[in-house]
From Swiss-Prot:
Protein encoded by which gene: Klp59C
Any one biological process term the GO annotation gives: cell division
Protein source organism: Drosophila melanogaster (Fruit fly)
Family statement drawn from the similarity comment of this UniProt entry: Belongs to the TRAFAC class myosin-kinesin ATPase superfamily. Kinesin family. MCAK/KIF2 subfamily.
Gene Ontology CC annotations of this record: centrosome; cytoplasm; kinesin complex; kinetochore; kinetochore microtubule; microtubule; spindle; spindle pole
InterPro entries: KIF2A-like_N (IPR054473), Kinesin-like_fam (IPR027640), Kinesin_motor_CS (IPR019821), Kinesin_motor_dom (IPR001752), Kinesin_motor_dom_sf (IPR036961), P-loop_NTPase (IPR027417)
Function: Required during anaphase to drive sister chromatid separation to actively depolymerize kinetochore microtubules at their kinetochore-associated plus ends, thereby contributing to chromatid mobility through a 'Pac-man' mechanism.
Domain Kinesin motor positions: 187-521
Keyword Cell division: yes
Positions of the UniProt region annotated as Globular: 1-183
Protein name per the record: Kinesin-like protein Klp59C
């Protein structure tokens, strides 16, 4: 106890095994011999009472006494060597004098000193604490800078992560007249168009979460949160035939989607082009034209541009020798009912199937047209009476499927030569979005979603060249039956419309998954060439800041526009034919029916029997193992 003093630093061992320094604040002598120590821990001060034995054990450097002098040590350690009994007898007889042997002094080993280890551990903890504080300071500084870059934006963190993500993308977008490549025209084409933000959305500081790095790919940045509430981006990548950004006009969209189908109908085929997407995503704008005011202008819609190209193609060689006439019809499908938009009063029509299994819309008018101006008049008449309503997503939402058909007939016998169906589908809706709407609006949404589901199944069956098409599932597919049946004479183009807003990200993903599902099951698709979504899984703010600038973004490939699809499809067809051949029932073996044949067979030589057996085995293998 004499070597200890108040405010002296000593090492102590905690109950969990930790060893650190503590300060003596009280010494109790007598029988108890307790030492009271305390030490700071975080924002508090802790204390403990220790017996003297533990203090001595943990601090041997304090209680080590100085070594004795050499003479005393030598005298203390000198001992007489004890001889064995024979040795004692020899000493007693005087034959051997006693010899004092000095034992070598024992080496005193100092207890291990833990001072260096504890000091290093404390230094390491201090450095880690400083690094954490520096990282927290940098994070606070980054947050302040992010707020200052986009003041007043409640989603500034998401906006910054998306901005940093887009800086790593190389943009190569579709532009009208800037490419010399051949426009792909497959049996099923799927294109996506992203609409720009509206003025109201810009005023509300809506965030654009859709990026288009190339003319075939797009990425949807979905904001998510970890368990610890740290925000991050989950990037969903898609690949289609063509992707149009918000700067593309209707003319550019038409050039890559519907225009390649004009030549197909003049060659005697059936073509279908339809716009699909969430309500308010721009389907009617794309198909019908702009809205300069309350009324729609049909001058720059796909309807009018297709009609203009039809009349211009009609005058070119060799189609001018076919002597074709152009007819137009315009009708809508509201729920399960069909209405003619070109007749006064918009009468309801019946959809029936004749004896030739051809679906006929009874009473539908097909007006003959001579030029584009007459087509525009019909479009304005039909758009003025089309059914629309108010929803939570769009103040003027189309509640029906509008079908505008351009029909080519021969002038001699009025025989159908080709048909082009341009469809403005009603917007798909979720039940959670219109749960507060009235019963009629919910029923409309239910019928719309049902018809869109059947439409997708018909397109998938068309892509698989299936013998069964579920076109009777809805009035829409029933009316368009001749646009799905016909093999290579039928071509379809789908324009998926998406909204870039943050609050519509779920609708956008549903639309893109719908379109991708249609595309990936087509005949010419190449599933084996799907590339992995490298560096596109999920990205947090810290990951984006630390990422290298050489990060690449290559989304999945599930498109029929990729090269080599035809060979893959041919190989698939050959394999299917081989399987069909192998599954054909083999012919029954023939047996001799008369005794004469049995005698003849018994009388044949062994060589002939062996040859017959070999031939039979070869025929069996040829039938079952081509």
């Amino acid at each position: 106890m004499d070597k200890l003093s108040i405010e002296q630093k000593i090492f102590i061992r905690r109950s969990d095994g930790r060893v650190h320094l503590a300060e003596i604040i009280k010494l109790e002598g007598g029988d108890s011999k307790l030492i009271t120590v305390e030490w700071p821990e975080g924002h508090t001060v802790r204390g403990k009472e220790l017996p003297l034995e533990l203090v001595v054990l943990m601090n041997p450097h304090i209680f080590d006494s100085p070594r004795c002098s050499g003479g005393n040590a030598a005298s203390a350690n000198q001992t007489a060597s004890i001889s064995p009994r024979s040795m004692k007898q020899r000493i007693a007889t005087g034959s051997l004098s006693p010899v004092l042997a000095t034992a070598p002094p024992r080496q005193q080993t100092a207890p291990p000193v833990r001072e260096d280890e504890v000091v290093h551990q404390a230094e390491r903890m201090r450095k880690e604490r400083e690094r954490r504080r520096e990282a927290q300071a940098r994070t606070r500084l980054d947050r302040e800078q992010g707020k200052n870059e986009d003041p007043g934006n409640p989603n500034w963190e998401v906006a910054r992560m998306i901005r940093l993500q887009r800086e790593q993308m190389e943009s190569q977008r579709v532009r009208s007249g800037t490419t010399n490549e051949r426009i792909n025209c497959h049996q099923i084409m799927v294109c996506v168009r992203k609409r720009p933000l509206r003025r109201k959305e810009l005023a509300d500081r809506e965030q654009d979460v859709v990026s288009i790095p190339s003319k075939h790919t797009l990425v949807v940045h979905e904001p998510r949160k970890h368990v610890n509430l740290v925000k991050f981006l989950e990037n969903h990548s898609f690949r289609f035939d063509y992707v149009f950004d918000e700067e593309c006009s209707n003319a550019t969209v038409y050039e890559f989607t519907a225009r390649p189908l004009i030549k197909h109908i003049f060659d005697g085929g059936m073509a279908t082009c339809f716009a699909y997407g969430q309500t308010g995503s721009g389907k009617t704008y794309t198909m019908g034209g702009q809205f300069p005011g309350r009324h729609q202008s049909s001058m720059d819609g796909i309807y009018a541009m297709a009609a203009k190209d039809v009349f211009s193609t009609l005058k070119t060689v060799p189609y001018n020798k076919l002597n074709l006439k152009v007819y137009c019809s315009f009708f809508e499908i509201y729920g399960t009912r069909v209405f003619d938009l070109l007749m006064p009063g918009k009468p309801q029509l019946r959809v029936l199937e004749d004896r030739n299994q051809q679906v006929q819309v009874v009473g539908l008018t097909q007006n003959p047209v001579q030029n584009t101006a007459e087509v525009l008049d019909l479009l304005e008449l039909g758009n003025s009476v089309r059914t629309s309503g108010h929803t939570s997503a769009n103040s003027k939402s189309s509640r029906s499927h509008a079908v505008f058909q351009i029909v080519l007939r021969s002038a001699a016998g009025e025989k159908l030569h080709g048909k082009f169906s341009l469809i403005d589908l009603a917007g798909n809706e979720r039940g959670a979005d219109n749960s507060s709407a009235d019963r009629q609006t919910r029923l409309e949404g239910s019928e719309i979603n049902k018809s869109l589901l059947v439409l997708k199944e018909c397109i998938r069956a068309l892509g698989r060249q299936s013998s069964h098409l579920p076109f009777r599932g809805s009035k829409l597919t029933q009316v368009l039956r001749d646009s799905f049946i016909g093999g290579k004479k039928v071509k379809t183009c789908m324009i998926a419309m998406i909204s870039p807003c943050l609050h519509s990200v779920e609708h956008t993903l549903n639309t893109l998954r719908y379109a991708d599902r249609v595309k990936e099951l087509s005949v010419e698709s190449i599933p084996s060439k799907r590339m992995p979504d490298a560096n596109l899984g999920s990205t947090s703010m810290s990951d984006i800041v630390c990422q290298s600038s050489t990060q690449r973004l290559f989304p999945c490939a599930s498109s029929t526009s990729m090269p080599g699809g035809g060979n893959q499809a041919q190989q698939h067809t050959n394999t299917a034919n081989d399987l069909n051949r192998s599954q054909k029932p083999t012919s029954k073996p023939t047996y001799p029916t008369s005794g004469q044949q049995l005698v003849q067979r018994k009388g044949s030589s062994q060589r002939e029997a062996s040859m017959m057996l070999t031939k039979s085995l070869a025929q069996f293998r040829g039938r079952n193992f081509p």
